Amino acid sequence: MKSLQIICLLFVLVARGSCHSCEICHNFGKDCQSDETEECASAEDQCGTVLMEVSSAPISFRSIHRKCFSSSLCKLERFDINIGHDSYLRGRIHCCDEARCEAQQFPGLPLSFPNGYHCPGILGVFSVDSSEHEAICRGTETKCINLAGFRKERYPIDIAYNIKGCTSSCPELRLNRTHEEHGNGLIKVECTEASKITPSE
């Protein structure tokens, strides 16, 4: 469960942006509030709120993050990744011209069944080469997503992460390699057609 929490916090940091100050707060749950603001850096251009949900049956939790974001991440708006083993990583992104953007709430997970496709599944922290397992795609999930990146902090090594699984559509994310002291790098974005499950003989 610790890995799920770390992934949740890192995923919203892969794209950082120049225009004004935004409220900054992070909290577990559905809401957060703070008097603290941050001046957006040169690559950031909008204030935004990301509501994350990570579930690994039978446990799930949500977190909320308000800060400066790049316009490319704002355009993503939402993501739903089935990482296998009854686990999901979901996000809702809302950006605005105000210092505080309201969160877009989650609808309930739709009832869906295996659709005959599968993808590699990974939810890895501290490595971009984590061990894979099979993610059985469900409902409209016919694409395989592969995201890898790192978070640069004050540690001797970068905090790496790798996410793979089934998704319904391919997100439009740009690679973001950073050389800043405290930055975020999205070093791999791949989206391919899911494979058909071959019936056993």
Swiss-Prot record:
GO terms for cellular component: extracellular region. It holds the Pfam family UPAR_LY6. Glycans are attached at N176. Gene3D superfamilies: CD59 (2.10.60.10). SUPFAM superfamilies: Snake toxin-like (SSF57302). One of its GO terms (molecular function) is phospholipase A2 inhibitor activity. Optimum pH is 4-12. Important decrease in activity at pH 2. Residues 1-19 form the signal peptide. Coiled coil: none annotated. Keywords: Disulfide bond, Glycoprotein, Phospholipase A2 inhibitor, Secreted, Signal. Disulfide bonds join C22-C47, C25-C32, C40-C68, C74-C95, C96-C101, C119-C144, C137-C166, C170-C191. PANTHER family: COILED, ISOFORM A, LY6/PLAUR DOMAIN-CONTAINING PROTEIN 8. This is Phospholipase A2 inhibitor NAI. It comes from Notechis ater (Black tiger snake).
